Regions:
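N-terminal helical cap/lid subdomain that shapes the substrate entry/recognition surface
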Residues: 2-100, 115-118
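Residue-level marker of regulatory loop/turn positions in helix-turn-helix DNA-binding domains and
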Residues: 87, 109, 142
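Conserved SAM-binding loop
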Residues: 14, 106, 166-167
């Protein structure tokens, strides 16, 4: 095993939140007059902070993206997450196996706002694995695909990024991890749509391994 630290994205890696978040966002953008499909919503916002897509939203809605709207989105999103959120399958067993090996050298580095990340990890009983080691792209000079959140996490752990393994699920996140200087593995759910194309895009972004079950992760890391 060659890795000294593990840096996990949150959405789509630890929690199955993206369908919930995209559902709320899709509904609210329709209310603003942008009649995009769910596929278009995923294309524009997967792995990206909504606030960072301001220009795209304003172009299609012909309305300013206000702080009041962003606040309303977060409130509706958080309510939906509280009601519906589940952990990614097998992640609890994976974390239980990895924690004795890495202990406090595991961090969560998300592009989402801190409140959402903390809410989600607590909801699915994963927060204890990352307590004190949760990093939000909203608190960085730049969010993903810039490497800032991963650089901050590695610095906090006092581990060179070259010795860190990043677990991601989107091209945006993979790009961020690679730019930070870490090795990046990509998780793709076994029921993912258009899987071959999705894997190709992740590899093009720099993912060095793609895997399909969190149950496999501890063994893959041990063998690396």
């Amino acid at each position: 095993m060659r890795f000294q630290a593990l840096l996990f994205d949150c959405d789509g890696v630890l929690v199955d939140s993206e369908p919930i978040t995209h559902g709320v966002l899709h509904e609210m953008l329709h209310e603003q007059g942008w009649r995009l499909s769910m596929e278009e919503c995923v294309h524009h916002f997967m792995g990206r902070a909504v606030k960072d897509q301001r220009a795209v939203i304003e172009h299609h809605t012909q309305q300013p993206l206000t702080e009041a709207w962003l606040t309303a989105f977060r409130e509706r999103r958080n309510q939906a997450l509280e009601a519906q959120l589940q952990a990614v399958p097998h992640i609890h067993a994976a974390m239980a196996a990895l924690q004795p090996v890495f202990a406090e050298r595991m961090a969560c580095a998300s592009g989402a706002d801190r409140f959402k990340v903390e809410l989600q990890l607590k909801k699915v009983a994963l927060h204890a694995y990352f307590a004190g080691r949760i990093f939000s792209g909203h608190e960085m000079p730049r969010s993903k695909p810039a490497p800032d959140v991963y650089l901050a996490a590695a610095e906090h752990l006092a581990v060179p990024t070259a010795d860190c393994l990043v677990i991601e699920d989107t091209p945006t996140g993979v790009t961020a991890g690679v730019a930070a200087g870490a090795e990046v593995w990509a998780y793709v759910a076994p029921d993912a749509q258009d899987m071959a194309r999705h894997i190709e895009v992740l590899r093009q972004a720099g993912a060095q391994r793609v895997f399909h079950s969190m149950a496999d992760l501890p063994g893959l890391i041990q063998a690396a």
